[in-house]
C-alpha cells in the first residue's frame, strides 16, 4: 500500500464518523479531532433552518478546510427552507447534508424538529426530496428506531421505505427509541435500551441502503465487530471524552499505513490554531475545552484538566498555561 499524502483531505466515507453533538462538535472541536484522524467523517452541531436563514450564517457555516470530509446537520421540517439551507451548505463547500430526525428534546419538538418527525414519514420524505432536488452533494438522515407510540418494526420500515422512495440512500440509525415526553435528552440516551438487532434487521431488509449504526459504541474492537453487519459506525460521547481513540481509526478501520499522531504532536498542531483564534479576538478556552480527555489514563491527567479548564481563565498569558499542559504529555 502506498503511503497517503498527508495534506489532501480524505474521500468521504461513512465507515467511521463522529456524531453531531450540541455544544460539542463546533469548529474548534472538529479541527482538533481532524488532527487525530484523516478519514473520520465529522459532523457539525445541529443547525436549525431558522438560524441559518435568519441568523449569523457565516458563524454557523464557518469551518477550516482541514475539517473535510465534513457534513452539516440540519434541523427543520419545512421542505423549502431545508432546500435553501442545503444550497447554502453546498455553496459553503460541505460534503454532505444530514437531516436530524433523532433529537428528542422538548425545545426542538415544539418546532417540529428531530425525533418527533419519525411520526411523519411522508413529511420527512418531502424534506429529503426537496434537498436532493436542490443540491448535488449527499443528503442523509439520522434517526431513531422509533418513538413512543410508533415503535414497531413495521412502522420503522414504513419510515425508512418512504424516505428511501424520496431518494435517500444513507441512514444513520441510533438504535434506541426516543421517548418524547418525560425524559431529558440525556435520559433519552440512557433509559431506552439499545437494540442493535433491530438496526441489523433493517440492514437485512434494505440491503441496497447504507446503514450506519449509532448508539453506545465505545471501542474500536466494537466498531470492527459492528462493521461485519453495518456499512458504518458513528461514535458520539466516547469520541468526545476519549478523543485519542481516533488516532487509531485510520490504521485499524481504513488500512492506513501512516503512523498515528502522538498526544503531544496533536497538541503541537493545535497551538498555531489557538494563536490564530486569539488573534481574531477569541479565547483559548473555546478550543481547549474540547481536549480535556486527551490525557485520560495518564499520571497528571487531573493536572492537565485543571490547567485547561480552570487555570486558563485566570492566566494573563493563556498560551503559557497551554505549554504547561503540553509538557505533561511530552513524549506521549
Swiss-Prot record:
CDD domains: DUS_like_FMN (cd02801). FMN binds at residues 20-22, 73, 142, 174, 214-216, 236-237. InterPro entries: Aldolase_TIM, DUS-like_FMN-bd, DUS_fam, DusA, tRNA_hU_synthase_CS. Keywords: Flavoprotein, FMN, NADP, Oxidoreductase, RNA-binding, tRNA processing, tRNA-binding. The active site is at residue 103. It catalyses: 5,6-dihydrouridine(20) in tRNA + NADP(+) = uridine(20) in tRNA + NADPH + H(+); 5,6-dihydrouridine(20) in tRNA + NAD(+) = uridine(20) in tRNA + NADH + H(+); 5,6-dihydrouridine(20a) in tRNA + NADP(+) = uridine(20a) in tRNA + NADPH + H(+); 5,6-dihydrouridine(20a) in tRNA + NAD(+) = uridine(20a) in tRNA + NADH + H(+). The keyword Thylakoid does not apply. Its cofactor is FMN. Its EC number is 1.3.1.-, 1.3.1.91. It is an enzyme of class 1 (oxidoreductase). Catalyzes the synthesis of 5,6-dihydrouridine (D), a modified base found in the D-loop of most tRNAs, via the reduction of the C5-C6 double bond in target uridines. Specifically modifies U20 and U20a in tRNAs. Belongs to the Dus family. DusA subfamily. This is tRNA-dihydrouridine(20/20a) synthase. It comes from Pseudomonas aeruginosa (strain ATCC 15692 / DSM 22644 / CIP 104116 / JCM 14847 / LMG 12228 / 1C / PRS 101 / PAO1). The gene is dusA.
